[in-house]
């Protein structure tokens, strides 16, 4: 038989076993929030890792890897008269620079694809440039051919006859005449971090990628210069 409850006896708490106290509910809620936050952080990290692993590569990375390897190969020859050459440490495709030939026809650096180019920017107001020009002319005479050309681009912005007169005065006979009267070619290389003053020289491989860059003049026709450029061309 069910025992009778005394008149003053409190009712039994039938919810005590099923309803946790409020502090416990708050603790459970906080744990759930922490778990959700941790899961979100893990998801963000995983998405970031996936994105890094699968992001598109710079097209220059693959195309210009050979130029970086060429730079490493010739690094031991960066000495003496060409000690100031900075060989490429990372793949860099040289901008497709625009300039003109002696007849005023439009050219681009990409017109030399398949050939190694020693690109030189010079001006008549630049004393080191004028002194360097005979060495560049001699280098073209020694090594110029189907696989290599010294491309010296004048960037005088006034009096287009002045650079031509200078080249005639110093008997430059082997260099073709190229010019950019806007000097935009210099600004493009400067923006790319490859030009800081005059003269500026960039050795460009047949794919249009930087092998090395030099700020300032050099005796390019010296034994050091000829050996360096010949090595870049893989000539024996």
Annotated model-derived regions:
Residues 121-123, 153-156, 180-181, 214-217:
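Active-site-proximal beta-strand/loop segments in catalytic clefts of secreted hydrolases
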Residues 1-93:
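N-terminal targeting signals for export/organelle localization
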Residues 92-94, 112-114, 145, 158-161, ...:
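Extracytoplasmic
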Residues 131-171, 181-189, 227:
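Structural microenvironment flanking redox-active thiols in thiol-disulfide oxidoreductases
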Residues 116-117, 148, 199:
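Alpha/beta-hydrolase fold active-site loops
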Residues 113, 121-138:
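Conserved redox-active cysteine motifs that mediate thiol-disulfide chemistry
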Residues 165, 169-174, 180-232:
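Thiol/disulfide oxidoreductase modules built on the thioredoxin-like
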Residues 86-91, 96-117:
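A short beta-strand-turn-helix
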């Amino acid at each position: 038989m069910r025992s009778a409850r005394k008149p003053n006896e409190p009712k039994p708490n039938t919810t005590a076993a099923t309803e946790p106290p409020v502090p416990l509910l708050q603790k459970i809620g906080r744990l759930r929030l922490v778990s959700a936050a941790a899961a979100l952080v893990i998801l963000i990290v995983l998405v970031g890792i996936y994105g890094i692993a699968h992001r598109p590569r710079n097209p220059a990375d693959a195309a210009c890897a050979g130029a970086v390897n060429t730079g490493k190969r010739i690094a031991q020859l960066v000495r003496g008269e060409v000690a100031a050459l900075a060989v490429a440490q990372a793949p860099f495709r040289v901008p497709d620079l625009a300039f003109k030939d002696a007849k005023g026809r439009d050219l681009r650096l990409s017109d030399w694809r398949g050939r190694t180019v020693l690109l030189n920017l010079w001006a008549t107001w630049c004393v080191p440039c004028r002194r360097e020009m005979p060495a560049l002319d001699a280098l073209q005479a020694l090594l110029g051919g189907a696989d290599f050309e010294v491309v010296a681009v004048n960037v005088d912005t006034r009096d287009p006859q002045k650079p031509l007169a200078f080249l005639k005065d110093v008997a430059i006979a082997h260099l073709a005449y190229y010019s950019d009267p806007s000097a935009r070619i210099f600004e493009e290389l400067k923006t790319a971090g490859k030009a800081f003053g005059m003269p500026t020289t960039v050795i460009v491989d047949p794919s249009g990628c930087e092998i090395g860059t030099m700020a300032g003049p050099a005796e390019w026709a010296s034994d050091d210069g000829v050996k360096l450029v010949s090595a870049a061309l893989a000539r024996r």
